[in-house]
Amino acid sequence: MKQIKFLFFTLLFCFQAGTIAQWENDTRLTNNSSQSLLAYNNAKSISSDGNTLHTVWTDGRDGNLEIYYKRSANAGVNWNADVRLTNNTGSSYYPAIHVGGNTIMVTWTDNRDGNYEIYFKKSEDGGSTWSTDTRLTNNASLSDYPSIDASGSTVVISWQDNRDGNYEVYSKRSGDGGNNWEADQRLSSNSAFSEYPTVTISGLKVNIAWEDNRDGNREIYNKYSTDGGVTWSGENRLTNNSSQSTSVSITSEGDFVDMTWSDQRDGNWEIYYKYSFDGGINFGPDQRLTNASGNSWYPSIATDDAFIHICWQEARDGNNEVYYKISTDGGASWSGDLRLTNDAGASSTPSINISGSALHIVWSDNRDGNTEIYYKRNPSGNPIGIVPISTTIPDGYKLSQNYPNPFNPVTNIEFALPNAGYVKLAVYDMNGKEVAVLVNGQLAAGTYKADYIASSLSSGVYFYKLTAKDFTATKKMILIK
């Protein structure tokens, strides 16, 4: 589906106005007298499967630092109570999470054994029960800042480790969903520091990126694997400038690898982006995404076909706040920066996730005196299933009858727009209650098809309504299960 990146650059969803309207209020997820902290941006702090969200963090409420977890079963509307995942006399911190179906995997750094090691645990029932802690590393040095990703039964964890004197990047893989683990693999080898690795997997294609100062200043490097992390390419230098490139975050779908990082080449720290179309072998040019007087740090990236979402922390307004921007054409163009937080405290290390049409962000925030975990969502910030079927400008507005009708549970809705402008396509029940929003933002002129999946609704009569400028049309559809 990422062919949209090539075929439809004219699909310029200028979503900034729509996303401003749709981002909901901040939600405080933790409430205790200690500090609640997320991992750095090399790791994912929030993950999802469908409408079920899962997040992890470090918390000192029990005297020493432990790993905590909580979930939402309704796309972030409500959240369950905090669950303590670790319980030992050492400190546990920098947790990273991956979710696939009902399987939740968490990895973190832990010094219960005297030195810092990488640990792992998982749940196979959606977070209700958890396995015992599994120690993955065993050496006399420091192993920390883990990142995790999985595809099917293949799981890969990357981390930094100074068992060899200086920090190097290591990886470890499991071929059976985290039940058994293979030997550690050292991925970097130089006399300088290789740190803060971030990992992404799509099928058997694995990419790991990190920051490295072998060249005198910090640059971004990567390695890729085409066999699920069994063997690896050589090291590839991805940035090349006289300043510092740090804080890399990476994601992938098929052969498409998207990467963002912080870069000081322009005097202050800015957010940059680049992508690969061939699984991380070659990358396009660097793109500067921010241009502000304050420093921009710790970007987090999530993608869905041609839609690329990036959030980061930035101090252009005096204190650190969370900012966001979107590309709807595979990184060819970008929206303006959108400030998501606005309080007197510092908002830092945000982590972004996509679930269906919704966007979710968690971050650390000290507006309450101590640092707590906050959450924010945009229910329609990732417009899934919207496909441009023609860029020829139609003669007038048109809303077609859905097909098939009756349907179960998927149907298609076509609509035509003679002019660019704000468009809303929503579904309502018999009582007039809005039950789904398929489009809510700016669209270019053309003809589009929206895929609607009504798996969460019961059988009955529903209505879908298109609103565009002065045009409004409503049609009836029937769901039969």
Region spans (language model):
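Positively charged n-region of N-terminal signal peptides that target proteins for export
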Residues: M1-K5, K481
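Sec-dependent N-terminal signal peptides
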Residues: I4-F15
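Extracellular, repeat-based ectodomains that mediate carbohydrate processing or recognition
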Residues: A21-P383
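Glycine-centered coil/turn sites that cap beta-strands in beta-rich domains
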Residues: G385-Y403, F407-Y428, V437, K449-S455, ...
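Surface-exposed loops/turns
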Residues: N419, A444-A445, S458-S459
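Beta-strand-rich interaction surfaces with strong enrichment in secreted/lumenal proteins
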Residues: L438-Q442
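C-terminal tail/sorting-segment detector
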Residues: D451, S455, S459-K481
